[in-house]
Amino acid sequence: MKAQSHPPQTAITPALWLPYQLYKWLIIVPVLLLSTSIIGTMIIALCFLGLANWASRVLASLWARLNATVMLMQVKIEGRARLRPGQSYVLAANHLSLVDIYVLYGFTRLDLKWVMKQELRKVPVLGLACELMGHIYVDRSNSDAARASISKARERITDDMCVVFFPEGTRSRTTELRPFKKGAFRMAADLNIPVVPVSVHNTNRVLPSDTLDWRPGPVKLVFHEPIEITPETDIAALSEHTREIISNALKA
């Protein structure tokens, strides 16, 4: 079956089309820009004051929740109880849309460190704020530099901290999962911390890749059963098993 390149979005009736366009450009866009500038600047200041962890847990989460709310996203989280308090995890999630970050950061109540592409470092305010909070930039064009970044990430993991990977490496432009890269699974094996497959549903209906056509709608994030690491764990098999769990969840 051929993968769809653009999933159907939430329908907006003709009577609501113009009011929603006004809401989108007069409310959503200004809030996204202002919240990133203002909260990002506050985060940078707090990081210089030694409050990076608080800024990440509280202000960054507030930023994400605010933006998801103004975009009229109805967020549902499932499987959160599968995660043990005080345990670190590697979270491996599919990546459908830019708004995946809002869902993970704003609604999971977890202390997260992100592994993100190097290009985001250049985004004004946001790039510096993420770096100061301890998120990890990876140069996808340089495998040696990417491995060095992942090694640095290992040093930042403490109890109750989770590292978020999008193992596809970029947003999927279709309904099919891309092949998974192995960095997340090598880190989990090296640190002996469980991998949690995370399936993100319907965010590409709220904001498809490569567009600014926001639509209101429900989205869902599911934490699947953690996969424990053992001395016999095979990296390739772990990667494929995680991908299979997420793929099956997306097709269900």
Predicted regions and their residues:
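Short gly/ser/thr-rich secondary-structure transition/capping motifs
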Residues: 71-78, 146-147, 203-205
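N-terminal membrane-anchoring alpha-helices
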Residues: 1-76
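A generic structural signal for well-ordered alpha-helical segments
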Residues: 67-68, 130, 156, 188
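A residue-level signal for beta-strand positions that form part of recognition/binding surfaces
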Residues: 74, 88, 218-220
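Non-catalytic C-terminal accessory region of glycerolipid acyltransferases
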Residues: 1-15, 19, 147-252
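Catalytic core of membrane glycerolipid acyltransferases/transacylases, capturing the structured
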Residues: 39-62, 68-71, 78, 84-143
